[in-house]
Amino acid sequence: MGAGLGADSALGLPGENLQGVHGAVAWIEHMKLAKADMGAVKHAVIVGGGNTAIDAVREVKGLGVPSVTMLYRGTREGMSGYQHEWDAALQEGVSASWQSLPVAFEGTGRVQRVQCVKLDASKKPIAGTEFTLQADLVLLAIGQSKLGDMLASLGGITVNKGVIQVNAHGFTGRAKWYAGGDCTNGGKEVVNAAAEGKAAARAIDAAIMKGAARA
């Protein structure tokens, strides 16, 4: 099994249903299909600090948006995204607002502004530090939902915190069922999924050959 993860996670903030506010993964997929209309976008805000956020920042900047800001609740040193990718993004002209949190999206029909607040070291809002960012486009790169309920319904496998529990060979504990990728590791890189798929394939091949030898 390589079920991956579910839809982009949401923040549940006021104005999140405005046009122009999207999940980053869904937007990137849409953009790759050449369906993203960026003609009217002058200011973009990407919420998050992982590799998806950096991918989104660079894609948006590469499409010619003049002002692109990454809004992250932590510090640069604490972000999970690769530092070399962020260094490249800086060279391309993006900016960041560290230790910052969106509290509302505003606009008439379409997003125009993001209301934000600064955070202290414990990630608690600091009174009196509210600020506003202009935004024609907001992308939420705060993770993806896990398919725990669906996976658990399969029966015969163990699901913990939304991901399938497997051994080093991808075996789920249910006869002939192997899994790998985001549905087992919670969301890593393509290279991780490929490596886990190969490990499972080798284990499956070994099991088949062992059965053939017995026959």
Q: What positions do the PLM features span?
A:
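Rossmann-like dinucleotide-binding cores of NAD(P)H-dependent redox enzymes
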Residues: 57-104, 211-215
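Conserved beta-strand-loop-beta-strand element in the redox core of flavoprotein oxidoreductases
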Residues: 1, 107-132
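N-terminal glycine-rich dinucleotide-binding loop that anchors FAD/FMN and/or NAD(P) in oxidoreductases
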Residues: 16-31, 35-38, 80-107, 113-116
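A conserved FAD-binding loop/helix module that cradles the flavin
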Residues: 56, 183-214
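FAD-site-proximal beta/loop scaffold in flavoenzymes
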Residues: 17-41, 123-187
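Rossmann-like NAD(P)H-binding beta-loop-alpha module
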Residues: 36-66
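Cofactor-binding loop segments of dinucleotide-utilizing enzymes, especially the Rossmann-like FAD-
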Residues: 49, 72-75, 182
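Conserved Rossmann-like nucleotide-cofactor binding loop
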Residues: 6, 52, 76
